[in-house]
Design a protein with these regions (language model features):
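A short, Lys/Arg-rich alpha-helix, primarily the initiator
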Residues: 1-24
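DNA major-groove recognition helix of helix-turn-helix/homeodomain DNA-binding modules
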Residues: 51-68
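Residues within the alpha-helical elements of helix-turn-helix
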Residues: 24, 28, 60
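DNA major-groove recognition helix of helix-turn-helix
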Residues: 10, 42-43, 53
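Short amphipathic recognition helices of helix-turn-helix/homeodomain-type DNA-binding modules
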Residues: 68-75
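Helix-turn-helix DNA-binding elements, focusing on the entry/boundary residues of the two helices
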Residues: 17-18, 35, 54
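Recognition helix of helix-turn-helix/homeodomain-like DNA-binding domains
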Residues: 31-48
Length: 75
C-alpha cells in the first residue's frame, strides 16, 4: 500500500494549509493545480497518483526524495 505524506512534507516546510500549498505551487512552478486535486493529494484520497501532480508538488516544496512524500507499507 502506498500512502502519500504530502501533508507532513508541507508542514515540515512551514506550509500550514492546502491554500498555502496551492499558492506556493503557483508561485514556484506556474502550474495551477485545482484545489480539489491538492485536497486529494493532501488527504491521500486517491487510489491512483498522477505523477505530474506529484512532481509539481515536490518541485514547489523543493523535495527530491520520494521518501519525503510517500511511504510504502505491506498489507
Amino acid at each position: 500500500m502506498i500512502k502519500l505524506t504530502i501533508d507532513k512534507a508541507a508542514t515540515s516546510k512551514g506550509i500550514s494549509s492546502q491554500k498555502e500549498l496551492r499558492e506556493l505551487i503557483i508561485e514556484k512552478t506556474g502550474v495551477e493545480l485545482r484545489a480539489a486535486t491538492i485536497s486529494d493529494l493532501y488527504r491521500n484520497n486517491k487510489n491512483q497518483i498522477n505523477r505530474e501532480h506529484l512532481f509539481t508538488v515536490m518541485e514547489a516544496l523543493e523535495i527530491t526524495d520520494f521518501n519525503e512524500v510517500l511511504t510504502i507499507k505491506r498489507r
